[in-house]
Amino acid sequence: DGKPVEGDFEFLIAATFIGGIEFEIIQPIHGVNPYSKFLEERGPGIHHIKESILDNDALDAAVAEYSSRGPKVNYQGKYMEDHYFYLDTFDALGAYYEMGNNAKVSAKPEFVGWYPEEP
């Protein structure tokens, strides 16, 4: 809805690559966030697809270009150097369209697990 998220929230995420495509499973744990709102409003399903634009200036320009053509940013965030935007394309695509810079970020070791084993 474009409004700032108030308060703390937590979610779990599992990610893997199959070929050149990354798949994420996101489970909200507590607090209000885009993923918990999605589940409340729509139930389980595909939340977003993502386009990676590695350069931040190019990313900002692409988001501005897409937004000028109709789909507005309904959520954006930053985690360390990772910047991402969700465009409201649900009615047209059946999912939100994420654009982000795919910056490499680190997580605390206790938050990282590998299955079946670390590569």
Residue ranges and their predicted role:
Residues 10-24, 38-57, 60-119:
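Vicinal oxygen chelate
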Residues 28-30, 54:
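Histidine- and/or cysteine-centered catalytic micro-motif in compact active-site loops
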Residues 1-10, 31-47, 80-83, 107-117:
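A cross-kingdom feature marking solvent-exposed beta-strand/loop segments within repeated
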